[in-house]
């Protein structure tokens, strides 16, 4: 059969015509679908703006609080339950609703914004064991200012929640995370130290904060170390907490006895400490002993974890140590500390915080019983010092709690403080 006759036969065949038509329709639909997909990709690329915030970013918690404030009509929610312990010891429960994982739409300054909160169940945070999360904002247009405004509002909202409070951070893995809720700032005058001691420390810290250029011009590392030593209960940690509130700084709590703390991790934590924060190393004598005592017990000298003594020294004042940092260390036994740890450059100011003096006792009495005659405070101090000359502010405060509204009774029974 000639080729022309074969083509004419196919043309007259109804089955072939129908099949060819179906192929044509299918091809057209596939091309249209591909065109729509390419069009959507081009539209998203050129006419939409997207912002992704991973859970590790510091603004992630801010944005969740911001979403809670702005997505009041969202019907798909997750709950975050937390416990708050008051100074009286009473514990209250707080519930906070946040948008659940999924897609949400909010109206913000004349724009619809799509918010996608995603949770990867196959990926977890090895430090906390929680699934990996992220939140993605999508808006029409190409102006990034809308996202800057959202981040700025979220930051301001977080600052309002922390206003007048001190934020505590603790080390979790390789980063600092807030520890509990921000605490109400403790007034500096609520911690009564020996006369002039608090003013001397505050003046030194403030001078350091206000003069970074002085250190730079002279080639001196811009960091400052403090050591407060003395008997337990004399106000070392309490003063540091009050000082942070006075300076509007946060506190980074770091335990040197943490078994997971290594040299590299310590150096990293000190380098990524939040700005405007005080790094607090409490009871440093419990982690390391003097090298003179290490001969008898070398294992104890090397600490309870993977942190080495040389690693601590290098983190505080080594080639890789960071600047713009304030470190406070406390100890009850300064004689147990190695001289290399407390030399200038690592510890620039050492202050003894000891038992109550006559002046401290009078100040504490007047603060606890305002409006009483100064002679009563003098009388109380004399009675206490006759009973004992080694009494800590914590003991005096505990004693006052027994006579909340009875200053005369506190004076008459001061002999009970005798050891």
From Swiss-Prot:
EC number(s) from the headed UniProt entry: 3.6.1.-
Topology, Mitochondrial matrix side: 33-419
Expression sites (tissue/organ): Ubiquitous.
Membrane-side (Mitochondrial intermembrane) residue stretches: 2-15
Effect of residue 184 to C: In MC3DN1 and BJS; with mild mitochondrial complex III deficiency; causes a decreased incorporation of the Rieske iron-sulfur protein UQCRFS1 into complex III
InterPro entries cross-referenced by the UniProt entry: AAA+_ATPase (IPR003593), ATPase_AAA_core (IPR003959), ATPase_AAA_CS (IPR003960), BCS1_N (IPR014851), Mitochondrial_chaperone_BCS1 (IPR050747), P-loop_NTPase (IPR027417)
Alphabetical list of CDD domains matching this protein: RecA-like_BCS1
Enzymatic reactions: ATP + H2O = ADP + phosphate + H(+)
GO CC field: mitochondrial inner membrane; mitochondrion; respiratory chain complex III
Modified positions (Phosphotyrosine) in chain numbering: 181
UniProt KW Cell membrane keyword: no
GO biological process: mitochondrial cytochrome c oxidase assembly; mitochondrial respiratory chain complex I assembly; mitochondrial respiratory chain complex III assembly; mitochondrion organization; protein insertion into mitochondrial inner membrane from matrix
Cited Pfam families: AAA, AAA_lid_BCS1, BCS1_N
Keyword Phosphoprotein applies: yes
Principal location class: mitochondrion
Record's subcellular location: Mitochondrion inner membrane
Keywords (A to Z) from UniProt: ATP-binding, Chaperone, Deafness, Disease variant, Hydrolase, Membrane, Mitochondrion, Mitochondrion inner membrane, Nucleotide-binding, Phosphoprotein, Primary mitochondrial disease, Transmembrane, Transmembrane helix
Binding-site positions, ATP: 230-237
Membrane topology: Single-pass membrane protein
Record's function text: Chaperone necessary for the incorporation of Rieske iron-sulfur protein UQCRFS1 into the mitochondrial respiratory chain complex III. Plays an important role in the maintenance of mitochondrial tubular networks, respiratory chain assembly and formation of the LETM1 complex.
Disease affiliated with this protein: GRACILE syndrome: GRACILE stands for 'growth retardation, aminoaciduria, cholestasis, iron overload, lactic acidosis, and early death'. It is a recessively inherited lethal disease characterized by fetal growth retardation, lactic acidosis, aminoaciduria, cholestasis, and abnormalities in iron metabolism.
Assembly information from the UniProt record: Interacts with LETM1.
Listed name of the protein: Mitochondrial chaperone BCS1
Primary gene name: BCS1L
